[in-house]
C-alpha cells in the first residue's frame, strides 16, 4: 500500500535568509490531481510547529487510494523561527515580524514579509485551509477558532472548546477567508506529558475535516467528534510580576472546566521563593483553554492562562 505521504511530490521555493545560508527553503508536498484541494499548514509560529506537523504526517499514512481530492502540506512554514523554537524569525529588521499578521505578504519586504508572499499563492488556490498552531514549547492548548461560513470544519476538528475567531488583519486564515476559502485555526496540543494524545487527536480531527468535503474517502465514516463546548470571548491571565511559576493544575486540566476559586498556579520570588501571586479560577465555570503546565521562570506580564466562560 502506497501512502499519501509516500506519494507527496515535494517542491520548494527559496527565500533570502541570513548571511551564512543566503537562502532558506520553504518546502511543501502535494498529492492528488483533481477535485477539492485542502492545504494544511503547520509552524506558522516556530515554537508551535512540531506537534502539528506530526499530526499532518499521521493523516498522510492513509493509502493514497483514499485521496479523492487534492492535498497540499506545509510541515514547517517558518523555518528560521522553528530552528530556535521561537514564535517569529530572528532575522527580520529592524524588529521581529509575526508571520500570522502580514498576509498576503510582500516579496520585497523583510524575510517574514517575503515568506508570507510565497505562501499566499499556496493558500489562494485552495478550497479548504487549516492552519494548525497548537500550544508550543511553553504551553498546551485545547481549542479551535471558528470562522463564519466554516462552522462544520471547526466542529469536525474535534477540539474540546470552540471560540469565534477574531478578524485579525493580516492573519493567514483571515486572508484565506477573504478569498472565499473554508478555513479553521487549530490551537490544540503542545509540549507536555500528553503531547502525543493531543497529536493523535488532531490527526483524527483532520480525518473528519477532509472526509466531509470529499477530499478523503474512508472505508467507513470517521467517528463523530465529541461536541465541543462553545465559549465566550477569551481572557488572558498574565503575571503581575516576574518570578518562578509553579503550576497547581497540570496538563490534564487543559480542555476541561474548573469551578470558581480553584487554585491554578502561583508565582514565587526568584530570590526568596516568597509567594507573590496566586492564580485562581474567576468564573463559576472556567474553561481552561491554554495553560503553562510546567515549573518555569517567567517575566512580569507573561501570558500564563487563557480562559473563557461557556457561552
Model region roles, listed by residue range:
Residues 1-311:
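Structured catalytic-domain cores with a bias toward divalent-metal coordination
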